[in-house]
Swiss-Prot record:
Family: Belongs to the ATP25 family.
Membrane topology category: Peripheral membrane protein
Keyword match RNA-binding: no
Primary localisation category: mitochondrion
SUPFAM superfamilies according to UniProt: Nucleotidyltransferase (SSF81301)
Source taxonomy: Eukaryota, Fungi, Dikarya, Ascomycota, Saccharomycotina
InterPro entries: Atp25, ATP25_mRNA_stabil_dom, NT_sf
UniProt cross-references to Pfam families, sorted A to Z: mRNA_stabil, RsfS
Localisation per UniProt entry: Mitochondrion inner membrane
GO biological process, one term: mRNA stabilization
Transit sequence range: 1-68
Protein name per UniProt: ATPase synthesis protein 25, mitochondrial
Entry keyword set: Membrane, Mitochondrion, Mitochondrion inner membrane, Transit peptide
Cited function: Probable mitochondrial mRNA stabilization factor.
Organism whose genome encodes this protein: Candida glabrata (strain ATCC 2001 / BCRC 20586 / JCM 3761 / NBRC 0622 / NRRL Y-65 / CBS 138)
Length: 623
């Protein structure tokens, strides 16, 4: 009960406390504290105890001094600045002079942005400068540079490139995380990064190096020149407005010198490394290596290796091959092909461009035999390029064009046609067309015996082709042209045999172009009688049936000659009357050809007037 009534710790109780006594007092106590002035009297602090029976007693408490006030403190209302609540205390500027100083510093590091650049570039650069504290920010506009140099593939990577410097690898990593947050919040995309090194992987790398005998007692992290902590490069594809961001440490930025790569042509000189700066940088690196202990012999060996002369080439193998072929160093070229088997697929195209370069620039003659042996012996056995045979034929024709004496057109048959067929490839119509064009244009026989020799090669080539390829209108017309000279002075006796064979083969329905070639050839050689026999009997029509012969082709070949005797012979022999007998449809084109033929032999229209009215209906004239 005494412990219950010790209320000196509660002098201002305004509530009632009900306590149930379990042993001596079997009644409920109601206690209310009364606040008294602070007076040092033993009975100052007391409580009225009222039992259930109604008896009131006064219980004294030990005196105590009140060390607090029951009055509410009177304070002035505090006016809170909404802007200051969100600004940390260490970033608040108490003086206007400091604020102006900060503005001056920001103006000194103002970033120059391209004209008409997107808003995302402004936001990103501002975030890099203000929030991430990245310095030396440069922005290059590759979009406008592409307009001046559209063939430069370096400028097709993106539209804008940002280059900035971070203080350490940790700074690079943290900057990438913050930039990725900005991209996700503002544009809903995630950037793609290259160059990010996992810290766990870096620790494993260092432990692996530490296990080496020579480096076991060495603090590897002292070598800042070879540590990723001091030489890092984060390249980020922002996926927004084709912007690429490069975050580099200072050493890495100096080493890569990306500014010279992306700068316009008129500004490249501003970012070129001077010999003095390169010399200073090399000396600093050498001093850093020398500062290591003598037991770091592996690093010293690496230093010697880095300083020794480069024993490899940075030139592409294809360019090296071209340079050797220009000098006709076939032994060195063969060694290059052995070291780089992938060049065999490009060998023919490289050889063509090299020969054309030699011929056009210097005009020097080439050794066609050595060129042929080198290319033919080094082409791949398994050919996957679909354009290989076209390039190979062009290469052989180029050799023939450079020197037709050492590389004759006759070699096209074994070197190309036979080789292609023996490797399982089908000979196409383009192959025989090209060969026949070579015979007609390049060989160009001038006498009968030259024509016989050329025709022998034609027959040998035709034997390699299938009938489906040969018996086409375009091929047959070219074959017939090879039976005569271009001057129309000589023709082979087999010319007439070929005509008989074609009449038998096509059953009087010879293809149009082939028939036109035959008719023109007969007219050029003055074979008028054979021409009439061919037209009236060999490819004639059956009496009583419809005439389906190509009259337009026949009359066109005749009227183009302007030969009065030939046209008069055809009219007087009654050949044109077959148009009426065979019920040929006379359209306006055929009517014009008939009028031209009659006008050539009868300008005044007096002799063949009746025949003209019979053959040309009035309906065709009105049309």
């Amino acid at each position: 009960m005494q412990s219950l009534l010790q209320l000196k710790h509660y002098p201002l109780l305004t509530s009632y406390l009900e306590v149930l006594s379990t042993q001596k007092l079997h009644y409920m106590l109601r206690i209310r504290s009364i606040a008294r002035p602070i007076v040092r009297r033993p009975w100052a602090n007391a409580a009225r105890v009222t039992g259930i029976s109604g008896t009131r007693i006064q219980v004294p408490f030990p005196s105590s001094v009140r060390w607090y006030s029951d009055r509410e403190p009177q304070t002035e209302p505090v006016v809170k600045d909404e802007e200051s609540e969100h600004v940390p205390w260490y970033m608040r500027l108490e003086d206007d002079s400091l604020k102006s100083l900060n503005e001056d510093i920001s103006k000194q590091h103002e970033v120059r942005l391209p004209d008409d650049c997107p808003d995302s570039l402004h936001i990103l650069v501002k975030h890099l400068q203000k929030q991430l504290a990245l310095r030396d920010i440069l922005v290059f506009d590759l979009k406008n540079q592409r307009l001046a140099d559209p063939e430069n593939y370096r400028l097709k990577m993106c539209d804008y490139v940002i280059i900035c410097t971070a203080m350490s690898t940790k700074h690079c990593e943290r900057s990438y995380v913050e930039i990725n947050k900005l991209l996700k919040n503002e544009y809903g995309v995630s950037g793609y990064v290259e160059g990010q090194v996992n810290p766990n992987d870096e620790k494993k790398r260092l432990k692996r190096l530490a296990r080496k005998n020579n480096l076991g007692r060495t603090n590897i992290r002292r070598n800042a020149l070879n540590s990723t902590e001091e030489s890092s490069w984060y390249m980020i594809d922002c996926h927004v407005d084709s912007i690429f961001l490069n975050i580099l440490t200072e050493n890495r930025r100096y080493e890569m010198n990306l500014e010279e790569l992306y700068a316009p042509l008129n500004e490249k000189h501003l970012y070129e490394k001077s010999e003095h700066s390169m010399h200073i940088n090399t000396n600093n690196r050498s001093q850093a290596f020398d500062s290591l202990e003598e037991e770091d012999n592996v690093l010293l060996a690496l230093r010697k290796l880095a300083q020794q002369k480069r024993q490899y080439s940075t030139e592409s193998p294809a360019r090296s091959l071209r340079n050797e072929l220009v000098k006709e160093n076939f032994d060195s070229s063969k060694k290059l092909l052995a070291d780089n088997p992938e060049l065999r697929e490009q060998l023919v195209k490289v050889a063509i461009s090299t020969i054309e370069q030699i011929r056009d620039s210097t005009g020097a003659s080439i050794n066609t035999e050595k060129w042929y042996k080198f290319v033919s012996h080094n082409v791949p056995l398994v050919i996957q390029d679909t354009t290989f045979w076209d390039s190979y034929l062009k290469f052989l024709l180029l050799l023939n064009d450079c020197n037709s004496q050492t590389y004759s057109y006759k070699r096209l048959i074994p070197d190309y046609l036979v080789t292609k067929r023996s490797m399982g490839e089908e000979l196409t119509a383009d192959d025989i067309t090209t060969f026949l064009s070579v015979i007609s244009e390049r060989v160009n026989p001038q006498n009968y015996w030259d024509l016989v020799k050329a025709n022998t090669q034609v027959v040998e080539a035709l034997r390699l082709f299938d009938e489906e390829v040969i018996f086409t209108d375009a091929i047959l017309s070219k074959v017939i042209k090879t039976l005569t000279t271009n001057s129309n002075e000589h023709k082979l006796h087999s010319f007439y045999e070929v005509i008989k064979f074609l009449v038998w083969k096509y059953e009087k329905e010879i293809p149009i172009n082939t028939l036109e070639t035959i008719l023109k050839t007969l007219i050029n050689f003055g074979e008028y009688d054979y021409l009439l026999r061919l037209w009236t009997t060999k490819i004639g029509y059956n009496v009583g049936s419809k005439d389906t012969r190509p009259w337009k082709v026949f009359l066109k070949a005749i009227t183009e000659t302007q030969d009065v005797e030939l046209i008069r012979l055809i009219i007087e022999k009654g050949c044109l009357l077959d148009i009426s007998r065979g019920k040929v449809d006379v359209d306006p084109q055929l009517a014009v050809l008939l009028k031209t033929a009659f006008k050539t032999v009868d300008p005044e229209n007096l002799i063949y007037n009746d025949q003209q009215r019979l053959l040309i209906p009035s309906s065709a004239t009105r049309q």
